[in-house]
Design a protein with these regions (language model features):
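SAM-dependent methyltransferase catalytic region
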Residues: 1-249
Length: 249
């Protein structure tokens, strides 16, 4: 899903899978005790064609989602994560429904489920908690920092809620009674990613996954950053930390 390939026509196979993932990301996402060396011992017991097909299918699903308007794309991308399973009890990938429950209850924004939080809504509904919701989502210059993103689903929720408010502004300013064209919606989305959403990740793969969730395979700036020795960087090199976060490098 998140792997960065030099040639996107290349397949992810049992033979190159471990090479595509840095050691820290492997340790973070794989079940405890399953080293790269141990994984190689498992290879004869996997179906190589099935492994390759599943990897390609996930990436194709993202490419299909990239053709949709932002609201529909959020639904499609979040649905992909419903196919994933937690690697082990120490590495929990928070489900999209729980993200909606958590953030919707705390600060509001656009929730993609009904009031019972059981069924996905046709269109997201806005939850307004007053001052905190206004400060986070209705301030057009808001800057939102997500710390320790693994999947990008939390910043996806935040980005959509900021995007939806800016889309309303565009519609009002242009006095549109119809839907805003998808290309303009996408440009608003890209601007939100560039100007309003900032993400810190614990590993390189978490950064790649988060970027894939937010922008897919499209060329858009995402301010996602992986830092080694994060506490030291914040404490002793704060100016450099802020610049790198803003640059998304």
């Amino acid at each position: 899903y998140g792997a960065e390939l030099n040639d996107e026509n290349q397949d992810i196979t049992l033979d190159n899978f471990a090479e595509l993932i840095d050691n820290q990301s492997w340790e973070e996402f794989m079940p405890r005790g399953v080293t790269k060396e141990l994984f190689k011992e498992f290879i004869p017991y996997y179906d190589p064609d099935m492994f390759r097909a599943v990897g390609r299918n996930y990436r194709d699903l993202v490419r299909q989602a990239d053709q949709l308007a932002p609201m529909e794309r959020v639904k499609a991308v979040s649905r992909i994560f419903s196919y994933f399973r937690n690697p082990d009890k120490e590495t929990v990938l928070t489900p999209w429904r729980v993200v909606n429950m958590h953030i919707g209850d705390c600060i509001g924004g656009y929730v993609f489920f009904d009031e019972a939080m059981e069924t996905e809504s046709v269109a997201p509904r806005f939850i307004d908690h007053g001052e905190v919701t206004d400060a986070v989502f209705k301030d057009r210059n808001t800057r939102i920092l997500e710390i320790n993103s693994k999947t990008g689903l939390y910043p996806l929720y935040m980005a959509y809620s900021v995007f939806a408010e800016k889309l309303k502004d565009y519609r009002d300013n242009h006095m549109l009674a119809t839907d805003v064209p998808v290309d303009i919606q996408n440009q608003i989305w890209y601007n939100v990613l560039k100007d309003n959403i900032f993400v810190i990740c614990k590993t390189e793969m978490a950064k790649s996954i988060t970027k894939r969730t937010l922008r897919g395979f499209r060329r858009a700036k995402v301010n996602a950053r992986y830092f080694e020795d994060l506490i030291n960087k914040i404490t002793n090199q704060s100016d450099m930390f802020i610049k790198k976060m803003h640059d998304g490098k």
